[in-house]
């Protein structure tokens, strides 16, 4: 039941190979690179990483700049957490992805055969579809997907190390998310056109079966359509052909996440949990 508490409980996406995080993957698998470098200009540092083929799903917060201006800092903090919790729910439907990182305005999911996926691109599409079909609070994330070679590794200094993933697919997925035309559609997924190959939309996004009280199981009509390839100027990569899959049916949320975040801050203040310590 929704409510307010001062405790915190977290959960992690589980995969068939128990790689809940990139760190889990790196410490449990043979490294592609494991060396110490003594550079005459920057000094000594270690390089540890694994190269792999993967599909990146980038889901960015729509209107992040506007929200940051119109919401108070506390409201924005709550909005971001609501978005991330909702996103983690979507990633739970596919147990073959790893949450690469939470950014200030986006979440990156990583799919790979190394994590148990038979078709990483298809699995990423299924998670993206879930977002579009279950956007009850009108997050409308900007979604981009791209595949290719990435390097997962440790970065940092002797005081603190973190893990991350690097490579062209991350930039391409983020760019696809920002370059989708959206228009008057409920949600849109954008990706390089050549990744679609000869797939059929009806095979990829199969009809959802609903339980009708009188007619029993009934298949829902297809609400997604795929557009023709379109060329765009992609910074640093030249002309690229992209494709979009759009959900044409708008849901009717009873309340938006933007409104809900304001309500939560009001409740926090009314309960005396908002304490400024200047």
Functional labels for PLM-detected ranges:
Residues 158, 172, 179-183:
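Conserved, well-folded catalytic cores of nucleic-acid-processing
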Residues 1-42, 181-278:
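Intrinsically disordered, glycine/charged-rich C-terminal tails and inter-domain linkers
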Residues 125, 167-173:
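Amphipathic alpha-helical transducer elements in NTP-driven molecular machines
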Residues 88-89, 130-134, 175-178:
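Substrate-engagement module of ASCE P-loop NTPases
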Residues 91-119, 135-168:
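Catalytic core of nucleotidyl cyclases, primarily class III adenylyl/guanylyl cyclases
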Residues 62, 149-150, 194:
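Alpha-helix/helix-capping structural signal
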Residues 35, 39-123:
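Catalytic NTP-binding/metal-coordinating core of nucleotidyl cyclase/transferase enzymes
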Residues 123-131:
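Short amphipathic alpha-helices in soluble, non-transmembrane regions
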């Amino acid at each position: 039941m929704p409510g307010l508490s001062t405790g915190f409980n977290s959960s992690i996406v589980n995969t068939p190979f128990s790689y809940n995080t990139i760190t889990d993957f790196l410490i449990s698998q043979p490294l592609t690179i494991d060396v110490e470098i003594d550079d005459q200009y920057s000094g000594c540092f270690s390089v540890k990483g694994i190269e792999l083929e993967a599909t990146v799903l980038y889901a960015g917060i729509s209107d992040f700049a506007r929200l940051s201006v119109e919401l108070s800092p506390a409201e924005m903090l709550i909005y971001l957490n609501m978005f991330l919790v909702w996103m983690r729910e979507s990633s739970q439907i596919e147990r073959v992805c790893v949450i690469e990182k939470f950014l200030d305005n986006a979440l990156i999911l990583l799919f790979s055969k190394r994590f148990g996926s038979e078709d990483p691109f298809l699995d990423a599409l299924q998670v993206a579809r879930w977002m579009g079909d279950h956007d009850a609070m009108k997050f409308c994330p900007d979604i981009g997907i791209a595949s290719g070679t990435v390097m997962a590794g440790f970065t940092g200094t002797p005081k603190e190390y973190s893990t991350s993933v690097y490579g062209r697919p991350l930039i391409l997925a983020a760019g696809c998310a920002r370059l989708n035309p959206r228009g008057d559609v409920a949600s849109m997924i954008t990706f390089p056109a050549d990744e679609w190959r000869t797939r059929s939309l009806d095979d990829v996004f199969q009809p959802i079966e609903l339980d009708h009280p009188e007619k029993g199981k009934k298949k829902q009509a297809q609400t997604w359509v795929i557009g023709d390839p379109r060329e765009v100027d992609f910074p640093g990569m030249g002309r690229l052909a992209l494709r979009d899959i759009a959900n044409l049916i708008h849901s009717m949320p009873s309340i938006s996440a933007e409104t809900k975040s304001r309500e939560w801050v009001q409740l926090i203040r009314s309960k005396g949990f908002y304490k400024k310590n200047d």
